[in-house]
């Protein structure tokens, strides 16, 4: 689903629509989880909790845009919105195939949820039980939670951006551009001399987990990392007991991975003012831009890196 090619054109819009930011207990201001990533022609819905269908109406996005649903684990606040979303898509007459990814151990729960959906939909189920690629450009890695859980990472391949002025100076135009892209060299002119390196963009979701290697792998060089921040640092004991991240641990995860933008979410209902969590994450986030997600936010993917940081 991720694309990489040589192009003179800017990227299509890539945007995250935040549908909910609560953890297990919603509040008046925060619905349960839900994150819709609009990525070129794809719509990837992560962890739809209760009320996701209604939140999409408030956000002004159609369920028909969803092409893929990714569930990190089968606790209710991460998946109980699946039947409503599928039913709405069927009601709207969606004809395209919809792919549903989830941990293999959650098969009974997922099938029960799917059975509650009404209407006809071309739905394909994709359980996974180990780290690896589950679709083109989409990989999973195991997290450390109380039940089997996986985070997701969407990676666009690195590529090259053609520079029109350099093409013109080299006398290359029309069909010759395609030949140069295909062969890598044309009449002694290498592709590298008329183009610039373009790092692929990376997006990652790390939900319910204690700090672990899987979370670090997902976060590595992410342009946008959506990470749970259930507890403040002062509740580190609770975080360890329930296998969650504190705000500071989410910040440290971003720093270790060289993340550009860290979006905190999945907040405990005990917190009304989230600025404290942001500051705790910021203190350990290195150079990452730290933001607090709020319901119905729209977060644009950061502009491309000019170079890859190691």
Question: Where do the protein language model's features map onto the residues?
Answer:
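Active-site neighborhood of phospho(di)ester-bond hydrolases with catalytic His/Asp-centered motifs
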Residues: 46-49, 66-74, 103, 204-209, ...
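Short, surface-exposed amphipathic charged segments that create phosphate/polyanion-binding patches used
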Residues: 134-142, 154, 302-310
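Metal-dependent catalytic neighborhoods of phosphoester/phosphodiester hydrolases
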Residues: 81-89, 110-113, 272-281
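Active-site metal-binding motif and surrounding structural segment of the metallo-beta-lactamase
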Residues: 50-101, 124-131
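Binuclear metal-ion centers of metallo-dependent hydrolases, dominated by the metallo-beta-lactamase
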Residues: 130, 213-310
């Amino acid at each position: 689903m991720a694309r990489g090619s040589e192009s003179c054109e800017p990227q299509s819009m890539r945007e995250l629509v935040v549908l909910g930011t609560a953890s297990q207990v919603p509040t008046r201001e925060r619905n349960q989880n839900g994150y819709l990533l609009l990525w070129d022609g794809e719509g990837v819905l992560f962890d739809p909790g209760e009320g996701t269908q209604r939140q999409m109406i408030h956000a002004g996005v159609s369920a028909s845009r969803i092409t893929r649903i990714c569930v990190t684990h089968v606790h209710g606040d991460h998946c109980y919105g699946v039947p409503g979303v599928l039913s709405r898509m069927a009601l709207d007459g969606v004809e395209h195939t919809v792919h549903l990814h989830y941990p293999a151990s959650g098969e009974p729960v997922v099938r029960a949820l799917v059975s509650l959906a009404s209407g006809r939909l071309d739905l394909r189920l994709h359980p996974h039980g180990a780290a690896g690629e589950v679709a083109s450009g989409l990989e999973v890695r195991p997290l450390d939670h109380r039940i089997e859980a996986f985070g997701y990472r969407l990676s666009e391949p690195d590529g090259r951006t053609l520079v029109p002025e350099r093409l013109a100076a080299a006398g290359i135009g029309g069909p010759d551009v395609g030949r140069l892209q295909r062969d890598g060299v044309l009449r002694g002119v290498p592709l590298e001399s008329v183009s610039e390196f373009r790092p692929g963009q990376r997006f990652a979701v790390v939900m319910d987990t204690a700090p672990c290697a899987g979370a670090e792998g997902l976060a590595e060089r992410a342009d946008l990392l959506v990470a749970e921040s259930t507890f403040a640092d002062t509740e580190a004991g609770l975080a360890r007991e329930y296998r969650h991240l504190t705000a500071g641990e989410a910040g440290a995860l971003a720093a270790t991975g060289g993340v550009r933008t860290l979006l905190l979410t999945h907040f405990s209902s005990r917190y009304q003012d989230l600025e404290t969590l942001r500051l705790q994450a910021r203190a350990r986030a290195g150079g990452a831009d730290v933001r607090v997600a709020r319901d119905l936010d729209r977060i644009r993917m950061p502009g491309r890196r000019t170079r890859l940081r190691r």
